[in-house]
Amino acid sequence: ESAHRLARFAKRKVVTLWLPFVAANTVYTLLTNLFLKVNILTGDERILDLPGNLITTPVTIKDIIGRTAHWSVFDGGTQLGGAMWFIQALFQISLLYAGVEFLLKKLLRSGDTLIPQGLLAGVLLWLGWQAQRIGWNVWGLGIAASCYCLFYLGVVLHRVQHPHGPARGALCCAGAFVVLLVLGQFGSVGLAGNSYPGPLYLLAASLAGWMLVYEGAHLLARVPAVSGAFSALGRATMPIVILHFLAFKPVTWLGLLATGGESYLLAAFPIY
């Protein structure tokens, strides 16, 4: 029964996470030549003068097939699909967590898996930190190792945390915001590149960020109009993740029209 549930869980994650990742990156690859014609992407070498940008060359059918094979094992991604690192990490971590949970429940008579899962999360965080230090992130596994502990913390907090009343919730939000302001003086977290000052910093920033979002969401849920808007955003998470870099382009285009900027600057990433 438990093995059957694990298989169904894995199948669901393949359909809801892996397939959108591969499909979206493949579509972006298919549209590369069109994007080059309208300057959403560019082969103009002047774009390299802007930090974080790269030039793009036209693709062939062979390129599309080869790159799709790479996307299928999370080997790289497209520039416009850059935000999908989150989908990749969530797929890898959720499957690993579920697989470990299945094995632990088979091995442990008590059925309590939080402690061994926590130990594994600590080991993976250390490995993710070492991967960051040497610049290793093959197939996104460095990011997945670092983020496993955050998934674990989410499981723990889901069990023990309950929303506070308005007064305490507002106080928790304010406290979490202050903690994040203080932490911001010492560094930042960039999980898309597996970048953070250290394991303890990552944990502290993540806990504070979670508290701010969790308590803030419960406060906003008391306002019907706001609650409905956020519910709609939640249901549209996947399209937002896939399309939001592309959605920046109309904003950049309007800015270039207003300032008379050169057309190749439309390809500036993420925005000019």
What is each of the regions a protein language model found here?
Residues 1-272:
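Alpha-helical transmembrane segments and their immediate juxtamembrane cytosolic regions
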